[in-house]
């Protein structure tokens, strides 16, 4: 009788596991459900031309920014409970990017409830030569600079949405975006333009270049 009860219990467990959507384990399914998700789609922003994944841009359009979505910091991808590909594509496209997606019907989502994405740390990786440093030099006194993100593959067309996003990084404590001319300015912390950090933000969001000029507002 005891053996029969054990076998029956195991059978119920197996039946319950097979009924879980998307092939998720009970623990992972409960984890996704905790975010209001059934984990059906996984999408991320990619750069034009290269197809490189852009974690910075992906994180900016996921989680708190998109209902019923969760940012998987391990993968750098956005998970959807519903088919939100059109909405997420609009986000990627607004930053001059493409989008890639795949179905999660056969993928087991790893638990990553404690994962966090350090967007600031990404800005310091592979820092390029400062693109605005020459502009920012004026004897011993630094010269105020303003910058904007531009599409270097399309004649330097300014990318307002990318500039706005790059201007909102935590490093720019007093940074602000001006709608009139599409530049990012900072009254005091504009040295981040000359150090290459703003360039990195444009790069992380959209593989964009920068256009930097002296800021006459603070001359």
Swiss-Prot record:
Top-level taxon: Viruses
CDD domains hit by this protein: KP6_alpha (cd22804), KP6_beta (cd22805)
Residues that carry a glycan: 98
Molecular function via GO:
toxin activity
Q: List the disulfide bonds.
A: 32-39, 43-101, 45-92, 62-78
What ranges does the record give for the region Disordered, renumbered to this chain?
A: 120-142
Q: Where in the cell is it found?
A: Secreted
* Outcome (variant: residue 78 to R): In strain: NK3
Print the keywords alphabetically. Cleavage on pair of basic residues, Disulfide bond, Glycoprotein, Secreted, Signal, Toxin
- Say what the protein does: This protein is lethal to sensitive cells of the same or related species. The KP6 alpha subunit is known to recognize some cellular receptors before interaction of the complex with KP6 beta, precipitating cell death.
Additional remarks = The KP6 toxin polypeptides interact with the cell independently, as monomers.
Protein's name in the database: KP6 killer toxin
What is the originating organism of this protein?
Ustilago maydis P6 virus (UmV6)
